[in-house]
Regions:
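Short, active-site-adjacent cap segments at secondary-structure transitions
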Residues: 6-7, 39-42, 123-125
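Short His-Asn-centered micro-motif
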Residues: 2-3, 35, 79, 118
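Flexible gly/pro-rich beta->alpha loop and the following alpha-helix that scaffold active-site loops
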Residues: 1-31
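Catalytic nucleophile loop
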Residues: 22-46
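Amphipathic coiled-coil/heptad-repeat helices and related helical stalk/stem segments
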Residues: 18, 98-101, 203
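C-terminal and late-domain segments of enzyme folds
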Residues: 47-48, 52-188
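Structural preference for alpha-helix termini/caps and helix-kink/transition segments
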Residues: 181-246
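Residue-level detector of anion-binding/catalytic polar loops
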Residues: 31, 114, 232
């Protein structure tokens, strides 16, 4: 999900089946990618960019979709952190509203909330399995607590604890309707149909080891066994490739 109006995204997605399905798929292991307006919308509090920058409304907090509350992380995200579209005349950093108005917005946040500032052409990969965050792209990510910045350049890593007290839900389906959960599980099962079973991976590794020993009889026998189980092993310049038989 990407560009548009953050507040429009919040209004359209809040309480919808689509949003529940996204949350459910994430709980089941899917990777979610958000950018621009969408990444603002998923925070605990959203920045009403168009209302401030285009319409001229006063700075205010707008409750967001709060995706990270599922994981006990009170986060808001601001992209276009280092934007310079306004040149020397207008400060368009901090997602076009400028530093002065951003400070006003930041000071409205409740105590204990963290804001993630994303420079342009830069992303933050949050890996909940490893407990690490990695800065990708060309610039940096800024973390703000009580509006005090900590900057992480591209290529750097930091623990997810920097974002808050990360906790998995006690039950994966907590807070999600039965309908959405069942639909998400069905979709995940379909996705997994193409996954290579662990047994095939093990046999392919044994075959590769046999080839390295130049034990061609064993290697051919393992290939035949893999084929008999409905899979094919192909030797490519990048290594072995296991594919399901058509």
């Amino acid at each position: 999900m990407g560009p548009g109006s953050p507040t429009y995204a919040v209004r359209q997605l809040r309480g919808s089946l689509a949003w529940e399905l996204l949350r459910a798929r994430h709980r089941l292991g899917a990777a979610l990618v958000f950018a621009s307006a969408a990444v603002i919308a998923i925070g605990a509090y959203s920045l009403p960019v168009y209302e401030i920058y285009k319409v001229g409304e006063d700075v205010s907090l707008v409750p967001g979709l709060d995706l990270f509350s599922d994981l006990n992380l009170p986060l808001s995200v601001i992209p276009h952190w280092n934007n310079t579209d306004g040149g020397d005349e207008i400060d368009t950093s901090r997602c076009f509203i400028g530093i002065e108005r951003f400070i006003q917005w930041c000071n409205l946040l409740p105590t204990g909330y963290t804001t993630v500032g994303l420079d342009e052409h830069t992303g933050l990969i949050i890996d909940f399995d490893t407990g690490k965050c990695t800065v990708s792209g060309v610039s940096s990510v800024t973390l703000l607590r009580a509006c005090n910045p900590e900057i992480f350049p591209f290529g750097s890593e930091f623990p997810i604890s920097k974002l808050g007290s990360f906790i998995y839900p006690e039950k994966p389906d907590v807070g999600i309707s039965v309908e959405a959960w069942d639909m998400a599980k069905s979709a995940a099962e379909i996705d997994n149909l193409g996954a290579v079973p662990a047994e095939m991976v093990r046999l392919a590794k044994e075959r590769q080891q046999a080839r390295l020993r130049q034990d061609w009889v064993t290697a051919d026998s393992l290939r035949q066994k893999i084929t008999s189980l409905g899979w094919l092993v192909q030797d490519t310049p990048e290594g072995q490739k296991i594919i399901r038989q058509p």
